[in-house]
Amino acid sequence: MTENALLLLNLGSPDSTRVEDVRRYLDQFLMDPYVVDLPWPLRRLLVSLILVKRPAESAHAYSSIWWDEGSPLIVLSRRLQEAIKPHWPHGPVELAMRYGQPAIEKVLLDLARRGIRRVTLAPLYPQFADSTTTTAEQEVRRVIAAHRLELEVSTLPPFYDQPVYLDALVESVHPYLQQPHDHLLLSFHGLPERHIRKLVKDPAHDLLAESSRNVSPEALALCYRSQCLRTAEAFAERAGLEQGRWSVSFQSRLGRAKWIEPYTDAKLDELVQRGVKRLLVMCPAFVADCIETLEEIGMRGREQFISAGGEDLVLIPCLNDHPAWVGALADMSGRLARPL
């Protein structure tokens, strides 16, 4: 029987916390036209300006969360890779990053050299965005074409509303919900509004809607924000959360362009003003803890919340290598993958 490799795909991380490694990583990341969607000359100019100060600032942030084994994102992704192997009897399980190492190109070439002819991609992004899902899949297409690889590739589509994914979220978060708390904030990664407007052509599509319930199927398939809301609503229903005891926000905005709202930093202050003292925060757009969860929320967000008058902010870990998530990912990859 022909082996079918499972290739886990995530965003990536610098090789180390050294400024030069962080600069190289940021340059590769920000020069991706799916991330900064400007014409090349303008993109190069903007990224060059960003790279004057940002590498040192980011290196400091990475240093605050770096583990002895290396980047938390890479370490946790490796743990997931090892944990899923017994659940994937069809072939090897590999890991690749869109930026940094292990590079998609290197991993695909290695699989081809080993005689693998079928690959199932598992982009580890529950919700769809060009800057995550599309760019990863396009890089796979580029490598296959550039090296004329004879690979039959399928890919796991976004799984923001899949029951097994939602059940894994509920199971992983359940112990934290048993702790005394006033509110649960679901903080998703943000996105420039224009990224969504380019895909969703309906001028009536509301990027300030508080619910996904009235979003058309056509818009839902392309709107990252609506998919985040759908995840949050389905999670809240499954977890039995009371209305008013949870809310949604979007973090990590960069630059002056308008990003999807509400912003997490503004939401933290708002919750304090509403009397929330003990806050739980989960980040369902990420399946592995990384700088955006550990440093941006777990450190800076916590400091902001307490400085504003809150008593405590507890960051709930991502799915990482939770057994329920391991089983869910293997199940979805085998059952839902479609031709690339």
From Swiss-Prot:
Gene3D superfamilies: 3.40.50.1400. It is found in: Cytoplasm. Its main location: cytoplasm. Pathway: Porphyrin-containing compound metabolism; protoheme biosynthesis; protoheme from protoporphyrin-IX: step 1/1. It comes from the Bacteria. GO terms for biological process: heme biosynthetic process. Keywords: Cytoplasm, Heme biosynthesis, Iron, Lyase, Metal-binding, Porphyrin biosynthesis. Its EC number is 4.98.1.1. Fe cation binds at H189, E292. CDD domains: Ferrochelatase_C, Ferrochelatase_N. One of its GO terms (cellular component) is cytoplasm. GO terms for molecular function: ferrochelatase activity; metal ion binding. InterPro entries: Ferrochelatase, Ferrochelatase_C, Ferrochelatase_N. Pfam families: Ferrochelatase. It catalyses: heme b + 2 H(+) = protoporphyrin IX + Fe(2+). PANTHER family: FERROCHELATASE, FERROCHELATASE, MITOCHONDRIAL. Catalyzes the ferrous insertion into protoporphyrin IX. Belongs to the ferrochelatase family. HAMAP family: Ferrochelatase. This is Ferrochelatase. It comes from Pseudomonas paraeruginosa (strain DSM 24068 / PA7).
